[in-house]
């Protein structure tokens, strides 16, 4: 039993450490990017805009797709790098959540009876 307690304490200490690291990195990103929580009016404005854009896209998908391509071509190298970094962060956090949820890096645990292959 003491072996399991020692192992659990190790996992707990690692979880605390990485939580603190994540909080500190998040604070630095929050400050450096000048982030702030949105106001209710900003949230409403964004969702109303998204709704209008979705309706426009549904009505004229070809025109909307051409506009999207035009915007993509107008982005600078710095913007592509910044958005690429955001994408990598999102994928990394999603993957971390998947790993935590599965409790292993690859595949899903099987809780049923084990099959024997001959």
Curated annotation (Swiss-Prot):
It comes from the Eukaryota. The keyword Membrane applies. Keywords: ATP synthesis, CF(0), Hydrogen ion transport, Ion transport, Membrane, Mitochondrion, Mitochondrion inner membrane, Transport. GO terms for cellular component: mitochondrial inner membrane; proton-transporting ATP synthase complex. InterPro entries: ATP_synth_F0_gsu_mt. It is found in: Mitochondrion inner membrane. Pfam families: ATP-synt_G (PF04718). Disulfide bonds: none annotated. GO terms for biological process: proton motive force-driven ATP synthesis. Its main location: mitochondrion. Belongs to the ATPase g subunit family. Mitochondrial membrane ATP synthase (F(1)F(0) ATP synthase or Complex V) produces ATP from ADP in the presence of a proton gradient across the membrane which is generated by electron transport complexes of the respiratory chain. F-type ATP synthases consist of two structural domains, F(1) - containing the extramembraneous catalytic core, and F(0) - containing the membrane proton channel, linked together by a central stalk and a peripheral stalk. This is ATP synthase subunit g, mitochondrial. The lineage of its organism: Eukaryota, Fungi, Dikarya, Ascomycota, Saccharomycotina.
């Amino acid at each position: 039993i003491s072996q399991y307690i020692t192992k659990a304490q190790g996992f707990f200490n690692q979880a605390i450490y990485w939580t603190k690291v994540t909080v500190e990195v998040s604070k630095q990103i929050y400050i450096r990017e000048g982030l702030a929580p949105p106001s209710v009016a900003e949230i409403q404005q964004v969702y109303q805009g998204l709704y209008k854009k979705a309706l426009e896209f549904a009505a004229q998908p070809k025109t909307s797709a051409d506009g999207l391509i035009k915007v993509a071509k107008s982005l600078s190298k710095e913007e592509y790098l910044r958005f690429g970094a955001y994408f990598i962060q999102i994928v990394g956090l999603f993957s971390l959540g998947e790993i935590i949820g599965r409790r292993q890096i690859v595949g899903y645990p099987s809780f049923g009876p084990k099959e024997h292959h001959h």
